Amino acid sequence: MKISVFYEHIEKACEQTKKPLEEVLEHVKKSGIDGIEMDYDMLSSEDDEQSILTSLKKARLVISSIYGFCHLDSDPEEQKCLDVIDQAAKNGCSRVLLVPGFFSEADAKIFGESADDWEKTVAFMQSNQVVQNIMAGLRRAVAHAKEKNVIVTLEDFDSTLSPCSRINALKWFMEQVPGLCWTLDAGNFAYSSENILDAYEVLRTYTAHVHCKDRG
């Protein structure tokens, strides 16, 4: 098992301790952490990318996953989701986490009312245009990622507006997009009041990555 930490948390540690980035990264490595969870937007500038990668390499740390917020809800042909994958492949990172888009308040209400029931969830997902756009975009992304030896994942996202926030919805996406995997976030089911053990029972065969989080 390999352990990683979010780069944003490293930046926060620098801010709180007033220590330079290099010293915090050295502490991270000495603590048994080998990987960094990276926001794609932090790497979108060539100068920022080079600076971050140089610091990580010096500390003997690698990027374990790159996550990116996309807009497949409105544009299944969006380029950004492919750019996230390309960035991962470029840096030897084997997985990405895509946050593919969000519902309107009205659609989120209907989604929430059906999410506890599998058959109702299936009916909603099949009829909702946002979901259909996301599904098409994810199929395209997974096909592109396969060529790059990168795994595409979704997580149980912590928002009632997210089509990926409920167990049944995640199961539906996994079944409809062959090759798609799950990043288990241990804290985000607090938003849907669903049991993480129930989620694991349903989705464990799709698990590729874990975010450990205590929201108790």
Describe each region flagged by the PLM.
Residues 58, 73-182, 191:
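Active-site acidic/histidine proton-transfer and metal-coordination neighborhood
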Residues 37, 65, 97, 153, ...:
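Conserved beta-strand positions in the central sheet of alpha/beta enzyme cores
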Residues 11-21, 75, 163-167, 171, ...:
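Gly/Pro-rich active-site loop or hairpin
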Residues 6-12, 39-43, 68-72, 101-103, ...:
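Active-site beta-loop-alpha junctions enriched in small/polar residues
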Residues 1-95, 124-132, 181:
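N-terminal pre-domain/capping segments
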Residues 53-54, 174-175, 201:
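Short, surface-exposed basic-aromatic patches at helix termini and helix-loop junctions that form
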